[in-house]
Amino acid sequence: MSKKIFLLFFTLFTFSLKVPAYDFENAGIYYTVSSRQKYTVAVTSSPQQRSAYRGEIVVPPSVVYEGKTFRVTEISKRAFQGCAQLVSLTVPASVVEIGDSAFFACTGLKYLVLEDGEKPLRVGSNSYHGVSAGQAIFHDCPLETLYLGRELQYEGGFFYGYSPFYKKKELSLVVVGDGVRTLENRAFYGCESLESVTIGGRVASVGNFAFYACKMLKELVVKEGNLPLEIGTNGNGKNLFSDAPLETLYLGRDLHYPESVGEIYNPFFQKGTLRTVTIGESAREIGSHAFQGCHSLVSFTVGSGVDRIGDRAFSGCISLREFFFKDGEGTLFLGVNRHSTSSKGEALFFDCPIETLYLGRTLDYSTSYFDGYAPFYDQQYLQSVVVGEEVVSLGDRLFWGCHSLSTVTIGGAVEFIGNYVFKECTALTEVVFRDGELPLYVGYNKFSPNGIGEPLFSDSHLHSLYLGRTLTYNMSRFYGLSPFYQQTELSSVTVSDYVMQLSQNIFYNCSALTELVIPGSVSVIDNAAFLGCTSLKKLELKDGRAPLSLGYNLFSEMEGRTLFHDTAVETLYLGRNLQFLLGEEYGGAPFSRMKKLRSVEVGDEVRVIPDDLFKNCPVLESFVVGKAVETIGNRAFQGCGNLSRLVFRDGEKPLLLGYNVHEPSGLGRSLFYDNPIQQLYLGRELRYPDTIYYGYAPFYRKETLTEVTIGEGVSVVGDRLFYGCTQLDNLQIEGTLSVVGAYAFYGCPAKE
């Protein structure tokens, strides 16, 4: 009888293995109904068991059965047992339990996705041994890639195999999603092939031994989060990542780790493999000694939320060449590398051979001798600095002694540059002040109470300058007169539309400067701005409606000097109405006595050419008058003995001309009396004092004049305008003259 019962039991057991129970199938996945009241189902094994589940399986969050929607809440025990051809599995957030041995003998399962979910996922084990080591749920699976979007709950003891991913030696990539709060002890213990781990922003803690023996872990990403991340250790005086040869780190949050003597639990202390570090936006502090001894560290980026970097944070970082402070509004306090009570200290980056720096933060630091003066003091390898748009000040001595520094870009929000900032920056050739609306105050290199001090860039050999700001500074000789004083190699200067004023002495003795364009935004060019600019040959004052106030070079009761006295300007574009002090003590009008000026073009915003403006410019050959000029003052071209080409551009309003010499008792001299004009284009009606005392008319007896074109818009030619122009044999009248004054063309061969 007992033998019959045993045979019956064996037959039933065998049948149960071969033909698992299920209620329905949907899209190749088999289900049993867990609860008809709650409308829940569980994934179960297939009738074919070892062959049904293969390739990629995506478990849906819900299925339709008998016309009703059931939530998938469970993967049953042994559901995928023996499915050796199952390669990829995705488990939805609706699943809250995975039964024991669910993946027994799934020897092909490489890719696992546990989708994001708020509820924990309870997982069983592969086998339980009460007297020896058990096996975790994925023991038989050669997992390579894992997305963990759920909090896992499991028996973590020795008899259950510690953790679901314990000693997964093929696992190379892990991403922990935002649904996870905790990575338990030994979470990835012994994952010898693990190369990259991403930890979600809501993970609050990582337990002890979580990455023990992860000997290939090179990349770690800790995403931004609202709370610090508490991390454990590897035990025996070792930090959590002591076994990991990390090379790349993204740290989006502050880390908290157990306090210790000698920083042994600091996770990155003396991490000699680390090469690249980025601190994310949720981190607030880089602690003391944080990256001390990371001798292979090459590049470091500090997030905008960091407000403090502690002492010795980069001590021994002897390969650190790139440093980036991301743009941020707040002030960032920096510690030191070594404070000394009796000798010169060491600044924070003393050990770092930084070559490239992006500074997006305003820095607060000690300028004391005992703290090494400034964080980048004496950075011998620093070549390039860019200061971002959130920085408002550059403190004293910031780049003192950076002998290799060649280019500096200063953001448009900087309002203050302290003293000695670029002292001994002997390789500095290019400076860019980015566009900014507010004036920028700049300090000096040396104050000298008994002589000329040293300006901010006195130790540099500038070649190129972009000036996007109005600069203010102490103009006294005791402070070096101006930041660019005696920059004798400065050959290229660009002034932007944000500049309102060129202050006193600004380009004093910039003897290599050859051309300059001054935008229409500039309203003042102060005294001695171009003193000693002996190579300046081309000057363009761009169009602007507001008048431009010009200073002078030298005030002297005997004989002053005009603003452009020292220049060698040959070509001038004048797009502005000018205001200036007219008198011999100021040297006269700003463009008078310009001995090399050959060509002048007056733009269409100019209304007035003042008295004496181009007086005594002996080589001036060509002059173009803009269409909006309404008045040309007296003596404007007196002494211009080479002016042969004159153009009055087409304009609607008449143009009033002054005179050259007024003789109250005899024949005066008209405006162009001194000028041997040969070619004339007349696009305007001219008005002038038509009396003997002023020389009758502007071209009266102009015997050099050979060619005249009268534009289409001109209908009136005044009295005696071309009287006695005996060489005028080429006269073109493009329009119709309705009024021709008395003797207008008297003696002109072309008229005859």
Predicted regions and their residues:
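Sec-dependent N-terminal signal peptides
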Residues: 5-13
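Boundary at the C-terminal end of the N-terminal hydrophobic targeting segment
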Residues: 16-23
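Consensus positions within tandem repeat domains that build extended binding/scaffold surfaces
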Residues: 77-79, 99-102, 135-137, 163-164, ...
